[in-house]
């Protein structure tokens, strides 16, 4: 399995699709199908039935998964979208690096 370029908690921007230009925080990543759920992006309305536990039915808004190829990480230094690379530090740790500025991405 490849190293994760986008992780939970990262700030990302959508680069293509109906939500192009939207920014948000990654809520979850699904490595099996290469998708991520981003807060406030790709929101769909879902109709739910009431259940026996007392939960109300109705229309709820839910964030839908977006393919990772449609997302770019926001550079922590410049605030602009950037590609992600990897670097091995002197202490042997492998860290993510913003390609545009060379800044280490925490997370």
Swiss-Prot record:
Keywords: Ribonucleoprotein, Ribosomal protein, RNA-binding, rRNA-binding. InterPro entries: KOW, Rib_uL2_dom2, Ribosomal_uL24, Ribosomal_uL24_CS, Ribosomal_uL24_KOW, Translation_prot_SH3-like_sf. Pfam families: KOW, ribosomal_L24. It comes from the Bacteria. PROSITE patterns: RIBOSOMAL_L24. One of its GO terms (molecular function) is structural constituent of ribosome. Signal peptide: none annotated. SMART domains: KOW. GO terms for cellular component: ribonucleoprotein complex; ribosome. The keyword Cell membrane does not apply. GO terms for biological process: translation. Part of the 50S ribosomal subunit. NCBIfam families: rplX_bact (TIGR01079). Belongs to the universal ribosomal protein uL24 family. One of two assembly initiator proteins, it binds directly to the 5'-end of the 23S rRNA, where it nucleates assembly of the 50S subunit. This is Large ribosomal subunit protein uL24. It comes from Gluconacetobacter diazotrophicus (strain ATCC 49037 / DSM 5601 / CCUG 37298 / CIP 103539 / LMG 7603 / PAl5). The gene is rplX.
